[in-house]
Amino acid sequence: MNLLDSIKSENTGFETTLIKGIEPIRQFVLAISIYHLFDTKLFSLLIKHEVASPEVACNELGMEKEKLLGLFRYLKNEGILLETIDGFSLSKEGHALAPFEGWYVMLVGGYATTFLQMGERLQEGAGWATRDATKVGVGSCGISHFDAIPLTRSLMAQAPGTCTKLLDLGCGNGRYLAEFCKALPQIQAWGAEPDRGGFEEAVDLIEKEGLSHRVHISHSGAVEFLDSDFDFEPDFIVLGFVLHEILGQAGRPAVVNFLKKIVHRFPAINLIIIEVDNQFDNAGAMRHGLALAYYNPYYLLHCFTNQLLVQDADWLDIFAEAGLSLVTRETTSDQVDSTGLEIGYLLRRA
C-alpha cells in the first residue's frame, strides 16, 4: 500500500485536518499581501478611485498588469477586494484594514526577514538577525497614533508646567512629532533618528506638514545626540521604545549612565519613557487576544534582534538607580489595548 492509499484508509478526514494544518501558511501569505497593498500605494489608489481597473493602477503606479492581476485576484479570493466589470475595489473588510497599516509595516515590512532568519540564527555563534530599521520606525510611528501618542499626552497633562520644547530621541519617521506640533501649537520640537531612511522620511514629512519652522530633525542615535553640542533646552524628553535597544546592545550600566546624563544636563526635565513590560512567560497575560495577535510575535522578534525587553519592576529599579523619581505611570487605553503591557512612565529628577 502506498502512502496515499494509507492516508485514505486510515484517515478519511485527512482533508479537514490538512486545511487546519496549513491555515498558518494562508495567514502568512495574506499578511504579506496586505502589507504590499499598503506599501505599493495600491491601497491609497483604491481609496482614491473607489473602483480601479488594472490598467489605471498600472498606469499610475508603473506596474506590470499580469502580476497586478495575480495580486488582485488573490485578494479578491480572500475577501479583501471586490471585482466588477469596471475593475477592483476594496471590500468592507478591505476598508476596515486602513487603521492597521502601521502594524503591517512594522511586523511584516520591518521584521519579515527577521522571522525567516530564525532557524539559522538559533545556531551557536550565528549572531543576530537583521531587520529593516526604516520600516520598523515608520510602522512604529503609525501604531503610536493609537497607543503611544495618547499615552504621552496623558502623561504630559500630569507633569508640572506646560510643554513648549519637546525632544524626541528616536523619532522614527517624525509622525509622532508632527502630530504633537499640530495638536499643540505652542510646541517647538527636535527629533533625533539613527536610521538614515527614517531620518530622511522624517525630514520629508515635517516639510510636507509645513512644520519645518517648528521641528528640527537630526540624523543621530539617542546617546550620541545627547553627547553632542546641540542648542536646545527641552522641558520634555520622550524616549519611546528606545531604552530596551540600549539595554540589549550596551547593557544596564549604559542605560543608567544615559539617564543620568539627561538629568545632569537638564535638571528640571520631564522625562517620558514608553516601554513594553516583558510578560512573554506569563501564561495568563498571553491568553489575551491582542497578546497573541501582537505581543507574542513582538516578544519573539526581540529575542533575535539584540534588543532586551524587561519587566516593569526592572525598569523601576533602573530609573531609581539613575536618580529618577516616578511621578506616575500609565498603560494604554482599554479601547485600544487592554493588555496593560505597554507602559508609559513620567519621571523627574529625584
Swiss-Prot record:
List the catalysed reactions.
5-guanidino-2-oxopentanoate + S-adenosyl-L-methionine = (3R)-5-guanidino-3-methyl-2-oxopentanoate + S-adenosyl-L-homocysteine + H(+)
Does this entry carry the keyword Methyltransferase? Answer: yes
Coiled-coil region(s) at which residues? Answer: none
Q: What happens when the gene is disrupted?
A: Disruption mutant cannot produce MeArg.
Q: InterPro entries of this UniProt entry?
A: MrsA, SAM-dependent_MTases_sf
Q: How does activity depend on temperature?
A: Optimum temperature is 45 degrees Celsius.
Query: What EC designation does it have?
Result: 2.1.1.243
For this UniProt record, the keywords arranged alphabetically read as follows: Antibiotic biosynthesis, Methyltransferase, S-adenosyl-L-methionine, Transferase
The answer, when asked if Transcription regulation is one of the entry's keywords, is no
General function of this protein: S-adenosyl-L-methionine-dependent methyltransferase involved in the formation of the rare amino acid 3-methylarginine (MeArg), which is used as a potent antibiotic against the closely related soybean pathogen P.syringae pv. glycinea. Transfers the methyl group from S-adenosyl-L-methionine into 5-guanidino-2-oxopentanoate acid to yield 5-guanidino-3-methyl-2-oxopentanoate, a precursor of MeArg.
Known NCBIfam families for this protein?
Answer: ketoArg_3Met (TIGR04543)
Per the record, the similarity remark reads: Belongs to the 2-ketoarginine methyltransferase family.
Name of the protein in question: 2-ketoarginine methyltransferase
**Species this chain originates from:** Pseudomonas syringae pv. syringae
Question: What is the gene name?
Answer: mrsA
